[in-house]
Amino acid sequence: MAQEQGHFQLLRADAIRSKLIDTFSLIEHLQGLSQAVPRHTLREILDPSYQQKLMSGDQEQLVRFSIKPRRMGHITHSRRLLSRLRVRCSRMPPLSLWAGWVLDSSVFSKFIISLIFLNTFVLMVEIELMESTNTALWPVKLALEVADWFILLSFIVEILLMWLASFSLFWKDAWNVFDFFVTLLSLLPELVVLLGVPAHSVWLQLLRVCRVLRSLKLFARFRQIKVILLALVRALKSMTFLLMLLLIFFYIFAVTGVYFFREYSRSTIEGLEYNMFFSDLLNSLVTVFILFTLDHWYAVLQDIWKVPESSRVFSSIYVILWLLLGSIIFRNIIVAMMVTNFQNIRSELSEEMSHLEVQYKADMFKQQIIQRRQHSESLRGTSLGKVSEDIIETSDASDDDDDDDDDDDDDDDDDDDKSDATESDNEESDSENSESENSESEKIDPEKDYAKKSYPEKSHPEKSYPEKSHPEKSYPEKSHPKKSYDEQAEAEKVKEESKEKAYPVSHSISSHGSTAADTAFLENLDWETLVHENLPGLMDMDQDDRIVWPRDSLFRYFELLEKLQYNLEERKKLQEFAVQALMSFEDK
């Protein structure tokens, strides 16, 4: 086909050709197995009413299964471990599966969070009772020590469970690594005491302070705190070069202050309060940071002016220039970048939340559609059951009336035969015409009585008895060479009225099916109006139901679709040629 369309190849046409080959190879494979193509869906098999019909009529047909993947929001490691073949085939579940189940449970998470808050309270009480020598408080101190050890052991057990669940995944998570180092720093002072180090050692006191870091474990427990910390880290990453430039200016102004304020730092004048601020590089860096925060800048400047050896002009230029660069320019830039980063993160989070909200609304809407369809099917089933009962009742009643009508029709036929035998002249023919009209009126009256008897209040679509009622029976051959056209038209009109009375249109048709009038009305509608009227019904339809095309139609569809791609490509080239021709025409 590519050679027929041209010597060029199209990716879309090749994709359609491959789809055609794959589809027909699958069909041939299915035909080789069962000599049939799947014509039924899983929903039809699960429907009890339709299933009974299929099992009684065609039991060898294939069923098309539509598999719906269950998308979960968060797949835990324990769930992944449970789906592994080695775990599913093992006789006993592994300990890692049990550890993951414990870590994922909400009870264990709430227990760890309560221990973190309890640790904060215990440390607060220990600090208050540290210097107390009251012997009555020894039981309280012992209880606090036991609580401290219990909290520490609980944190260690949590880390061991994480290692047991997945040792490699533990070190890949930054929050788990942070939690591990916080627990290790709080464990070190207890280990040092067990090794025999004096309790009044300076290093031991510093390590005991690390127990306060256990409160930082809350960062890894609450999602909102994680978002704030991640926003800060992201903002600092974007301000890396700005902070480097700010540190360079810090260093320049600190070195300049040490060099130019030597006389002020070495002055022996009494009453100087800040003469040590520029004594060395570290003090100068601290002083520059103080000026950066606009703290005591005017008091420092006035204290420098007290020394005659220091230049007032240079000291004023130094302080004002640093205030302009550091306090006004750099600080405002840092604040602006922080606000911008937080706004970007907030917009991303709001977009994600809106997406989740839309997904939730879509799921709820789909669930409502399913419930509505199930409710409508249940109502339709009950209504059809009532209609079937009414049809059975009316059919029994109509059979009795049909027997009476047949007897009347036989008597009428005998009368007609006798009248035909006695016809001799025009007068007799006129009298025969009048008798035939009377006989027709007598035939119509039983039909009216039959309609009243068989359908007193209820009517049922698609149920008629043309063989028994004989509404079209008029015997034109026997009569009536002189019967006028007006009389025939009047007789046909009476017949139509009798039909309408015998078979009235039911209200149940509009609720359970489509009538001929509705069909004619829909045919006159335009496409857009038809789509808008049937859109609720289309939305209620199950999207998983598939229509199986015939083999020749499917092949023709793919063939035409492939030709369409080549036609579109030729149309595109012709448009390009036309554009070039118009451009050359304008140039000339």
From Swiss-Prot:
One of its GO terms (cellular component) is CatSper complex. Disulfide bonds: none annotated. It is found in: Cell projection, Cilium, Flagellum membrane. It is a multi-pass membrane protein. Residues 130-138, 199-201, 261-279, 293-312 are extracellular. Residues 440-502 have a biased composition (Basic and acidic residues). Component of the CatSper complex or CatSpermasome composed of the core pore-forming members CATSPER1, CATSPER2, CATSPER3 and CATSPER4 as well as auxiliary members CATSPERB, CATSPERG2, CATSPERD, CATSPERE, CATSPERZ, C2CD6/CATSPERT, SLCO6C1, TMEM249, TMEM262 and EFCAB9. HSPA1 may be an additional auxiliary complex member. The core complex members CATSPER1, CATSPER2, CATSPER3 and CATSPER4 form a heterotetrameric channel. This is Cation channel sperm-associated protein 2. It comes from Mus musculus (Mouse).
